[in-house]
Amino acid sequence: MEQGMDYWLGQIQQKDVGKRLQVGPDLIEYLLDRQKSIDLEQDQTLLDRMVDGLATSWVNSSNYKVALLGMDILSELVSRLQDRFRTQLGTVLPSLMDRLGDAKDSVREQDQSLLIKIMEQASNPQYVWERMFSGFKHKNFRTREGVCLCLIATLNVYGANSLTLSKIVPHICNLLGDPNSQVRDAAINCLVEIYRHVGERVRADLSKKGLPQSRLNVIFTKFDEVQKSGTMILSASDKNFDDEDSVDGNRPSSASSSASSKAPQTARRGVSLGTARRPGPSSAAAKTGGTAKEGAGALDEEDFIRAFEDVPNVQIYSSRDLEESLNKIREILSDDKHDWEQRITALKKIRSLLLAGAAEYDNFFQQLRLLDGAFKLSAKDLRSQVVREACITLGHLSSVLGNKFDHGAEAIMPTVFNLVPNSAKIMATSGIVAIRLIIRHTHVPRLIPIITSNCTSKSVAVRRRCYDFLDLLLQEWQTHSLERHVSVLAETIKKGIHDADSEAKIVARKCYWGFHSHFSKEAEHLFHTLESSYQKALQSHLKNSDSIVSLPQSDRSSSSSQESLNRPLSTKRSPTGSTVSRASSTTSKSTPGSLQRSRSDIDVNAAATSKSKAASGASTAPFISVAALPPGSYASLGRIRTRRQSSGSTTSTASTPADTRGRSRAKVVSQSQPGSRSNSPGKLLGSSYGGIATGPQRVPQMPSSEKRSRIPRSQGCSRETSPSRIGLDRFGISQQGRIPSAMRVLSSSTDLEAAVADALLLGDSRNKKKPVRRRYEPYGMYSDDDANSDASSACSERSYSSKNGGIPHYLRQTEDVAEVLNHCASSNWSERKEGLLGLQNLLKSQRTLSRVELKRLCEIFTRMFADPHSKRVFSMFLETLVDFVIIHKDDLQDWLFILLTQLLKKMGADLLGSVQAKVQKALDVTRDSFPFDQQFNILMRFIVDQTQTPNLKVKVAILKYIESLARQMDPTDFVNSSETRLAVSRIITWTTEPKSSDVRKAAQIVLISLFELNTPEFTMLLGALPKTFQDGATKLLHNHLKNSSNSSMGSPSNTIGRTPSRHSSSRASPLTSPTNCSHGGLSPSMLDYDTENLNSDEIYSSLRGVTEAIEKFSFRSQVDLNEPVRRDSKKESELGSCDVGIASPASDLRGGTDMVEGGRMALDNKTSLLNTQPPRAFTGPRGREYNPYAYSDSINSYDKTALKEAVFDDDMDQLRDVSIDHSDLVADLLKELSNHNERVEERKGALCELLKITREDNLAVWEEHFKTILLLLLETLGDKDHAIRALALRVLREILRNQPARFKNYAELTIMKTLEAHKDSHKEVVRAAEEAASTLAGSIHPEQCIKVLCPIIQTADYPINLAAIKMQAKVIERISKESLHQILPDIIPGLLQGYDNTESSVRKASVFCLVAIYSVIGEELKPYLAQLTGSKMKLLNLYIKRAQTTNSNSSSSSDVSTHS
């Protein structure tokens, strides 16, 4: 049966997808056969219905195969009907425009081809485009973009003559402001394509359109690029472009007046219809000056660095001018209602100000902090251009300011991380590049938790990127910046190694080796905790990678910091993967990949040093082979980073890197030759060969036997100076100036050769040339290391003054500070040494450094503390450091923490005696250069820092420094802060250090010094400590007072003297009595006073006063929050006059830091006992001693050993006889719990036992041990084992349930620690923390709790703020209406801030907390919510109504139940 149009119309109108796919090809065959489809051209009505069905049902089908088939059928209809299809365009074009925005590339491409075909065969381009203008305003952004791309294709196929472009350009100009970046890019590409065809008239026309200048600048730049590229196609008459009446693309030009209005058929056929479909591979994009990458939206670091300076020039006339500019910028950026182009201009202006030197102004950093919120808002903007500019500006700030951008980087980093998974490439890549730049330039430890927390993201893309960031961080940062977060890094890398995503795993393995280069012990520990399969994967990753810690391509390509120009040269890897580095090989076997030799031309003791290093390096496990030694084993300025080496290389010779001045040096690995060590590899680095002398050559002789004896002689011929050696070297040796004898210690035999050659080359005109390497010769001191002193005698005055007795002209002082700093930052030790010499010159010339130079120099010096070349560089560094501190001490307050802690750490290292003396000198200068109180606070912070694990030598150094500091401090410098209390408690435990008597003695002396410094304040501090600590300190002070009284009575000169404070001439404080001077011995007259006025009775009276003050002062130190301070004169008089023994009081409420007036009065009464004679007479000097039994009840076994150093033998006999009771069981548990990060299983058991005890109502245990238990539990929350952390929280929760009243004085500390536990990476710990926080909310006084929580809610980050808000909501349920009214102004700001938080859970918790407040005070809450927007207020009201409904239902149901 013949199938006609009716049949096919029925097939087209059916809905079944499967049948459509079957019918489609048959319909195409039908249309191709003109004989079968003869009725197609006869029945117009059926044709209209068929085209309508194809356009609406097929082309618009959700199944892309059906849509493609529909377009194929339409294409055949166009071919068949030609001009007659023109009547169907109104039906077809809307559907085809919709398909230009299809998600499938194939659909979009075929759609574009069909449109081009319609323009060619059914109509003309102008006719079609006049009906497609609505596509420029289509709701789908892909359609808008597709219409632009279709226009580009039309221009490429038909030229500009075919279109009236003046009608189209306004639509394109509208798209330049489109919200979507891809549409904006496509619109710009359209204009560029029009410019290619039309020429300069486009530029003139656009200037009249009223476009913003910034937008025009971008477009005109593209025009210029196209013009320079030579791809212009001027196919239209210029004069007609901007004249709407005369421009008609259909009008034939003079050159082709007889031609058809359509382009010739052959010309159209010659162009492929698919050449201009998408911006990526299209010819259009290629012709428009390389806009393909921009069309895709991706950015890289090169784009950022180019954009850094691509900003308008501005000038800053004053700090006020800068402040006004930044205020305007903040005002624009803080309001997202401003035009987005204004915001982009504001962001660019920040970069302009930076380039104009804004960082030099003091108020810049204060203003920059105020911009944090504006930056966050910009980074969250919906417009990609704003986000892009914000990220570029953040990257620029980081690269210019470095670590001074710490606060801004920390604030903005979480927001920028949210950009990483963004589907818009421009936003995602902007965020990624900004993070990379911040990591590279701003080395702030607080960024590490932000990065590691994102490593556990649910998004695979985010995890991959985060491990990339972590890898970059481990490559770029110095070890000291990572130390605080070692455990977090290890845990994160472990998770990465176990990650489900294979790519994330690979990067995590790379991170592991970067981590190993900083913390080998921790890395090895992590390695052993992994399953064998993961261990094998790590080792195979090491073997298979030719560059384990290699820099990513983007890192190698660009970096704007000056350090990047001098980035340390990497160790070279041979094809087998073995590392040739300065570190000694761990195997005694010499392999081709690890050939090394001692550098005897540099150091006369190098052979011995090399052997010792090799021996010490052989114990590394589990990495036995040289290949397993990670690059960068030295955490120093010259830390190694590997670079990729050609896989084709088969020799063990390293490739030739170029140094910072452009010269290339070949580090040849060679065998030692018998003739001369001047041919050694190091010699090739250090000297240049000028030629061979033609005259007779002399061998210098040592003038005396003494000198011969001091220079070690080698018995072979390899080290003897020879004529050939001098001839070879004489013209390349740099001349030496006159240098003081203290500095003339030769650090290498090269210097000896230089001195000898200088003496031989007098009068030679060729020696006038400038030296190759030594540019900065010092006027001051050289290093005088003991190890190098053998050659010092050869360095005589004559050999240095042989150049006419003066400093040569080339030894000039350079003003090129940047070059000096570049040398100091070099990876080559000799260049670092050279830089230090230049720096000494600068400092001695009183050349003060700018703020930026100081900042950079501090960063370099921080790295130099870990320099491995102690004999060559570190000693000179210490000398330079002393000068630097003396000259710039007023500008180094921010760097003091690093300076002081690093110097103290160095005191614990194995250094030569001379180097250690220089470290000590640096410490002395530091102590005298900075405020004492600031140094004291830093030391207290350092002692309590749990990330620091000082060895015994470092502990001694810290304690001695504190002692010397205390002898110079003013009493007011000693502040009783929480940090000081923790530090003092740790010093008390150091008095029982079992491994070192030096530590014990130094700790005891420090406690005595602090007691003498400010007796009342120190007494208050002891009162706030747990009783066990109090007892240990009090016993020690008892013995000290007794001993000092005996010694002062016997011999006044034996009394310990104290250096007078530089702040005041008198040591007495208002709270100290005259007898306190006996502790310090300020002057001979004061000593006489002590001898005359002090007797044993007075000493014991003083001691009793001190002890009573410790025990009693805090009874009045904390009063109930709801009651005013009441003074009971009777009690006060009793406190002041009664003769109390040393036994412990009954109450446990002894600790308190916030002293109220009554508490201070009580303390003053107690300390006043130091002035009074005791009411009783004593029978003898030992008539009033400590009663050991009074102490034994409250001293656990740990404290007994702690006090062995400070008690007498007869006291110890009594201590041993104490029987063990229930209290001793708790003491043993506490002793076990004090083994932090050790004995995991035992401590778990101890915590379980403690959990049982907490449930028993044993008053004596809590009276005695509560403070100690609490302190240990809170400290245990920082334990490495997550199970122990969770268990500690459960014990804490149980104590809160059973002993809530005891937490009154420790509320703030307990709340803070519990909330911090919510950040834990283990769910078990977080769950325990939530339970503990819930119990806390119900246990502590509501007002006290809220006062602690309010500042936390306002300042803390997620998840701490979330936990605090939830806790506050529970507390509000317990508070009275009146009390809530009073503290409402403190509560509301934090909740409103939380309502705006990016985390939905924080917003939700804030709303619930506001609902809880409303349920207490009702409508009185409304005035506080005035700043909420309408939508937020609406949401809040909705939740309030729900809560009211729920409450009414529950109350009615309870009423029903009671009546029933």
Swiss-Prot record:
Residues 279-293, 550-569, 645-659, 789-800, 1042-1054 have a biased composition (Low complexity). Keywords: Cell cycle, Cell division, Centromere, Chromosome, Cytoplasm, Cytoskeleton, Golgi apparatus, Kinetochore, Microtubule, Mitosis, Repeat. GO terms for cellular component: basal cortex; centrosome; cytoplasmic microtubule; Golgi apparatus; kinetochore; microtubule organizing center; mitotic spindle; spindle microtubule. HEAT repeats lie at residues 87-124, 163-200, 407-442, 443-479, 942-979, 1272-1309, 1390-1427. Residues 237-293, 545-605, 640-733, 778-800, 1041-1084 are annotated as: Disordered. It comes from the Eukaryota. GO terms for molecular function: kinetochore binding; microtubule binding. Residues 571-597, 669-681, 715-724, 1066-1078 have a biased composition (Polar residues). GO terms for biological process: cell division; establishment of mitotic spindle localization; microtubule anchoring; microtubule nucleation; microtubule organizing center organization; mitotic spindle assembly; regulation of microtubule polymerization or depolymerization; regulation of supramolecular fiber organization. It is found in: Cytoplasm, Cytoskeleton; Cytoplasm, Cytoskeleton, Microtubule organizing center, Centrosome; Chromosome, Centromere, Kinetochore; Cytoplasm, Cytoskeleton, Spindle. It holds the Pfam family CLASP_N. Coiled coil: none annotated. Gene3D superfamilies: Leucine-rich Repeat Variant. Microtubule plus-end tracking protein that promotes the stabilization of dynamic microtubules during anaphase. Plays a crucial role in chromatin-induced microtubule formation. May also act at microtubule minus ends. May be involved in the nucleation of noncentrosomal microtubules originating from the trans-Golgi network (TGN). Belongs to the CLASP family. This is CLIP-associating protein 1-A. It comes from Xenopus laevis. The lineage of its organism: Eukaryota, Metazoa, Chordata, Craniata, Vertebrata. The gene is clasp1-a.
